[in-house]
């Protein structure tokens, strides 16, 4: 049975401790970006599940400078525990959807902070022009740069329903160009999307096993107030996963994943004041404890059912 310290999967915490020699925390930053799915280039309503905060509901205020955002969050986190190293995580909206000189300014400012050891950027694969790729490769030579791509699913019918706005070939092209610059790529997937059963979700996992990715986020579908997804939910067009269904699904995904892929998330944090369903998702610690307990009982671990092609 494979284990990574105390966990039956290749956790981000394990990877960070190996790379940096101690526990490392992320500080969620707001670069003041928008998204082509919101500003009219592709659409105006965003992805069907996306909140008004653009998935950055826990990020700092864009009214503050990058340095001020980092310092504010470090002060808050360091009051609870001794921490010396942090990852600057640009999370809200699409964090390469801006002129390259603006991106150079904010990313360089983040990496120049003495307590920041790496940069993580959430974006879309259709927002990575050649000039931005050159910038990211340049920054990656100074400190590690990770790029998180929101794939969600490989299935085109689901992608159309959630208004993802790009083809799978676009993802593959962006991935190849990022890896040519030795930039680590994290893929964001959503479990529980309408029309996505276990087999379809595992098809996405099997596809990602064949790609040159370094990390993955397994995100539970959250129905958030004010989204178009919430309107469909309230019409009874789909139901959300219950807790046991979700844990079974996560275990399946982990068992089928390559053991080298780092697990950046196995559930998710939806803002409690916006969460409509599933309400059990707000008890994140309880969900994680149950997942670990169930995996131990079943002798389950990442890669258990992975078969190299």
Q: What is each of the regions a protein language model found here?
A:
Residues 104-108, 137, 197-214, 270-292:
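Short, electropositive alpha-helical surface patch
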Residues 169-228, 244-267:
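Conserved C-terminal portion of the radical SAM core fold
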Residues 74-77, 128-142, 173, 202-212, ...:
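Short amphipathic alpha-helices and their capping/turn segments at secondary-structure boundaries
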Residues 25-29, 86-88, 119-121, 145-149, ...:
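Hydrophobic faces of well-ordered beta-strands that scaffold small-molecule active sites
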Residues 1-87:
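N-terminal [4Fe-4S]-dependent radical SAM core
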Residues 77-79, 106-114, 134-144, 176-180:
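Acidic (Asp/Glu)-rich catalytic clusters
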Residues 53-73, 77-100, 115-128, 144-170, ...:
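Core AdoMet radical
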Residues 2-14, 18, 23-25, 215, ...:
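Auxiliary Fe-S-binding modules of radical SAM enzymes
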């Amino acid at each position: 049975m494979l284990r990574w310290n105390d966990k039956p999967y290749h956790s981000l915490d394990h990877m960070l401790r190996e790379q940096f020699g101690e526990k490392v925390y992320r500080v969620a930053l707001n670069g003041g970006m928008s998204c082509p799915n919101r500003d009219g280039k592709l659409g105006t309503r965003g992805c069907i599940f996306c909140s008004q905060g653009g998935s950055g509901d826990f990020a700092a205020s864009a009214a503050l400078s990058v340095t001020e955002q980092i310092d504010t969050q470090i002060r808050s986190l360091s009051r609870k525990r001794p921490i010396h190293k942090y990852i600057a995580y640009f999370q809200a909206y699409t964090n390469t959807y801006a002129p390259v000189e603006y991106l150079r300014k904010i990313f360089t400012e983040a990496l120049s902070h003495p307590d920041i050891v790496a940069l993580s950027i959430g974006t879309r694969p259709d927002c990575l022009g050649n000039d931005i790729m050159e910038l990211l490769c340049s920054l990656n030579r100074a400190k590690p740069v990770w790029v998180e791509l929101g794939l969600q699913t490989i299935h085109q019918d689901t992608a159309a329903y959630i208004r993802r706005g790009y083809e799978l070939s676009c993802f593959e092209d962006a991935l190849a160009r990022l890896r040519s610059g030795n930039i680590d790529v994290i893929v964001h997937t959503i479990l529980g999307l309408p029309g996505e059963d276990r087999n379809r979700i595992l098809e996405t996992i099997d596809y990602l096993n064949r790609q040159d990715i370094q990390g993955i986020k397994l995100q539970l579908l959250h129905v958030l107030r004010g989204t178009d997804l919430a309107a469909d939910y309230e019409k009874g067009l789909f139901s959300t996963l219950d807790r046991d269904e979700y844990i079974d699904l996560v275990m399946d995904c982990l068992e089928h994943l390559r053991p080298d892929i780092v697990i950046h998330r196995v559930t998710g944090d939806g803002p409690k004041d916006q969460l409509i369903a599933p309400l059990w998702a707000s008890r994140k610690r309880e969900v994680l404890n149950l997942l670990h307990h169930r995996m131990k009982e079943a002798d389950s671990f990442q890669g258990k059912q992975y078969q190299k092609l």
